[in-house]
Amino acid sequence: MLGQSSLVGYSNTQAANRVFVYEVSGLRQTDANENSAHDIRRSGSVFIKVPYARMNDEMRRISRLGGTIVNIRPYQADSNEQN
């Protein structure tokens, strides 16, 4: 299309493959998530793997659940993650 860079498709493909790890503290159990299959920890940090395309949605979800994002870092597939 007129006005679009030829690199747009390449960067979208590259971004689609990127995954980040959110370190989140302060998540709480609420009526909205009470029916989930697992409880949410009230203390400590939780690590959540998030694809690049879902980062904004996940930030909103964490905020709704009362969590605070402490750290965001790129996911390393060869690291010893406990997810």
UniProtKB/Swiss-Prot annotation:
<keyword id="KW-0793">Thylakoid</keyword>
<dbReference type="Pfam" id="PF01383">
    <property type="entry name" value="CpcD"/>
</dbReference>
<dbReference type="GO" id="GO:0015979">
    <property type="term" value="P:photosynthesis"/>
</dbReference>
<comment type="subunit">
    <text>Part of 2 PBS rod complexes, the conventional CpcG-PBS rod and a photosystem I-specific CpcL-PBS rod, both of which include ferredoxin--NADP reductase (petH). CpcG-PBS has on average 3 stacked phycocyanin hexamers (PC, CpcA and CpcB). Linker CpcG connects the PC stack to the thylakoid, the hexamers are linked by 1 copy of CpcC1, 1 copy of CpcC2 and the stack is terminated by a single copy of CpcD. The CpcL-PBS has on average 5 stacked phycocyanin hexamers (PC, CpcA and CpcB).</text>
</comment>
<dbReference type="InterPro" id="IPR008213">
    <property type="entry name" value="CpcD-like_dom"/>
</dbReference>
<keyword id="KW-0042">Antenna complex</keyword>
<comment type="function">
    <text>Rod linker protein, associated with phycocyanin. Linker polypeptides determine the state of aggregation and the location of the disk-shaped phycobiliprotein units within the phycobilisome and modulate their spectroscopic properties in order to mediate a directed and optimal energy transfer.</text>
</comment>
<comment type="similarity">
    <text>Belongs to the phycobilisome linker protein family.</text>
</comment>
<protein>
    <recommendedName>
        <fullName>Phycobilisome 8.9 kDa linker polypeptide, phycocyanin-associated, rod</fullName>
    </recommendedName>
</protein>
<feature type="domain" description="CpcD-like">
    <location>
        <begin position="17"/>
        <end position="75"/>
    </location>
</feature>
<keyword id="KW-0605">Phycobilisome</keyword>
<dbReference type="GO" id="GO:0031676">
    <property type="term" value="C:plasma membrane-derived thylakoid membrane"/>
</dbReference>
<keyword id="KW-0602">Photosynthesis</keyword>
<keyword id="KW-0472">Membrane</keyword>
<dbReference type="GO" id="GO:0030089">
    <property type="term" value="C:phycobilisome"/>
</dbReference>
